[in-house]
Amino acid sequence: MQLTFGDAEGLGKRKQTRCEIFLAEMEQVVPWRHLLGLIAPHYPVSGRPGRQPYALATMLRIHLLQQWYALSDPAMEEALHEIRTLRRFARLGGLDNVPDETTILNFRRLLETHGLAARMLEAVNADLVRKGQSLRSGTIVDATLIAAPSSTKNTDCARDPEMHQTKKGNQWYFGMKAPIGVDEFSGLVHHVRCTAANLADVTVTHALLHGKEDSVFGDSGYTGADKREELQTCKAGFFIAAKRSTIQAIGNKRERRQEERWEYFKASVRAKVEHPFRVIKRQFGYTKVRYRGLAKNTAHVLTLFALSNLWMVRRQLLPARG
């Protein structure tokens, strides 16, 4: 892409911003060729009558920018107009037209319609395996709550029918759950299954396993998972956290201390499952569902976890700095 005078502005020696450093790292670690190959068969080709589509690489980059910076379609369009760094990452020159919010929306719907978000997570993980990242040892399962708007002040005067409320501790939440299965050693997400918030964690355990693990770790919400019918053929050992009441019921102090040490060990292994949640919620700002319905939000969450995997191992993937 040829530089214009607008593009050349600010290319002199100056401090690199955190945004520029982050995007430079993502430029190197995202498997662009594999992702573009997944989407290309479904993306409209140029040369037909009418307005020509934007380059697929540009639209994919804009879509990923939306996930990293938690931007809506209108906000993404405005950010491309205002922020030179984002425009440069999207490969839009100073004289190029910026995709409007409807074009950005249509690209996201194309990914949702063809179920490409799940395949993007698979493509990212396959690329990480090729680069030496483990994704086939033990699995840790857990779920996080994602809030949804509980107000009925909208056109339908109703809440999203696919979202439900649940109680955690003494607090009530309305929204959905995002259960995930992560690798025991690397902490990378390999399976995601979004559900309504009121569905018990243990009911989707089978959907979070890849089938080759030798151990499964989970908190007390997964008690009895190994006895469920859909997991009878699973040969992995289940290491589920004991409930506090079970530990307190042990009368012998020595046995109780031994059981507590065992629980501490299991908790230290399970800690890795919290890292992807931190990345998507704190690093990428995903604290509330953006769309109505589980299908659209599941596609969004799948993309976020694919990007969180890349973010967590970016240091190992980047070339060594001298």
Task: Outline where the language-model segments fall.
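Polybasic low-complexity intrinsically disordered regions
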Residues: Q2-F5, P74, E78-H81, R91-G237, ...
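Secondary-structure capping and boundary motifs in well-ordered enzyme cores
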Residues: P31, R51-T58, D96-D100, F265, ...
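Helix-centered, glycine/charged polyanion-binding patches within enzymatic domains
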Residues: L3-E9, D214-S215, S220-A295, A299
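A short, flexible helix-boundary coil/loop motif
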Residues: E260, Q283, Q316-G322
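An N-terminal domain-cap segment
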Residues: L38-A57
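Amphipathic, well-packed alpha-helical segments that form the structural scaffold of globular domains
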Residues: L36-P44, N125, F277, K281
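Charged, often Cys/His-bearing segments associated with DNA-binding zinc-finger transcription factors
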Residues: M1-R33, G37, P319-G322
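Alpha-helical support elements that line or immediately flank enzyme active sites
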Residues: T58-A70
